[in-house]
Regions:
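N-terminal lobe of the biotin/lipoate ligase/transferase fold
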Residues: 1-93
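General beta-strand structural signal in soluble alpha/beta enzymes
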Residues: 33, 64-66, 113-117, 123, ...
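A short, structural micro-pattern
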Residues: 34-36, 77-79, 115, 138-140, ...
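Broad gene-expression machinery/nucleic-acid interaction feature
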Residues: 39, 80-82, 118, 127, ...
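Short, conserved charged micro-motifs
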Residues: 50-52, 90-96, 154-156, 194-197
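Contiguous, small/hydrophobic- and glycine-enriched helical/loop subdomains that border
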Residues: 77-122
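Long, positively charged amphipathic alpha-helical accessory segments at protein N-termini or as interdomain linkers
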Residues: 100-105, 109-112, 127-240
Length: 240
C-alpha cells in the first residue's frame, strides 16, 4: 500500500527536506502532493547565478532553494502543484514510467499531453511540467511540477538572469544549465476550475481514493532539523 501525503505546508525548504528524509529514512512507498509560496528551485548541480535573477527574487521576496536531485531550475507558487513519488525498487527504474503516470492523469482530464526527451510534459508544444529524479540505495525518488495557474510573468522573470560575461564557459565546465522552454498553464486548456479543484482531482487519482496520511510529530521534528541544518543554509544554496 502506498502512503499518500497531502501536505498542509507551503514552505519550499520544508518540502525539500521532507523528500530527502522520506527517501533516506523510510522504507514505505510514498506519494506526496504539495505546493509552495513563490520560490525558485535549482538542481543539485546547477550554478545559481546562471539560473536565477537573484536581485529580482530577493526584491520580490521569492525564496531561492537548491534541491538534492538533478535537473533544471523551476519556479513554484500556489498556482503550481508538485507531485513526488518515492519507491523501493530492486533494479534501476525506468523513469519514463513515472512520467507516464502523470500523462495518464492528464489524459483522464481530457488533456492530450505528450512527454519530451528530458521527461518534460507538453501541451500543444508548450511545457506544463518539468521533472527530476534521484536514487538512494534501493530507493528511487521522482518529482515533477504541474503548471496549473502559475504567474508566468514571475516565472519568466525569476528564471532569466542577466547574462554574465563568463557565464557560458563556467556553466559548461562546472554546472548543468537549464534548457529553456516556452510554457503554458494547464488552466488555459481545461474547463474553468480552481487550483484547489485540480489538486483534489490529482490527489484522488494518484491515491486511488486512499485516505490522507499526515506527517507524524517525529517526522516534522526530524524534517525541520534537516531544513535548518541544510536547506536554508547559504553554504548549500550557494554551493555553486
Amino acid at each position: 500500500m502506498i502512503r499518500c501525503i497531502y501536505s498542509p505546508f507551503t514552505d519550499i525548504y520544508f518540502h525539500l527536506a521532507a523528500e530527502e528524509y522520506l527517501l533516506k529514512q523510510g522504507n514505505e512507498d510514498i506519494f506526496m502532493l504539495w505546493q509552495d509560496t513563490p520560490s525558485v528551485v535549482i538542481g543539485k548541480h546547477q550554478r545559481l547565478l546562471s539560473e536565477v535573477d537573484q536581485e529580482w527574487a530577493e526584491r520580490e521576496q521569492v525564496h531561492i532553494a537548491r534541491r538534492f536531485s538533478g535537473g533544471g531550475a523551476v519556479y513554484h507558487d500556489l498556482g503550481n502543484v508538485n507531485l513526488t513519488f518515492i519507491e523501493t525498487t530492486p533494479r534501476l527504474p525506468e523513469f519514463v514510467t513515472y512520467l507516464q503516470r502523470t500523462l495518464d492523469f492528464l489524459s483522464s482530464m481530457g488533456l492530450m499531453a505528450t512527454g519530451g526527451e528530458r521527461l518534460g510534459i507538453y501541451l500543444n508544444g508548450l511545457k506544463i511540467s518539468g521533472s527530476a529524479q534521484c536514487l538512494y540505495k534501493d530507493r528511487v525518488l521522482y518529482h515533477c511540477t504541474l503548471l496549473y495557474d502559475t504567474d508566468l510573468t514571475a516565472l519568466h522573470q525569476a528564471l532569466n538572469p542577466e547574462p554574465m560575461v563568463d557565464d557560458e564557459t563556467l556553466s559548461s565546465v562546472y554546472a548543468v544549465p537549464s534548457v529553456r522552454s516556452e510554457v503554458t498553464n494547464i488552466r488555459r486548456h481545461v474547463p474553468a476550475g480552481t487550483v484547489t479543484d485540480f489538486k483534489e482531482k490529482a490527489f484522488q487519482y494518484f491515491s486511488k481514493s486512499q485516505s490522507v496520511s499526515a506527517f507524524t510529530r517525529e517526522e516534522i521534528e526530524a524534517i525541520n532539523q534537516l531544513r535548518e541544518e541544510k536547506y536554508i543554509q547559504k553554504e548549500w544554496i550557494y554551493s555553486r
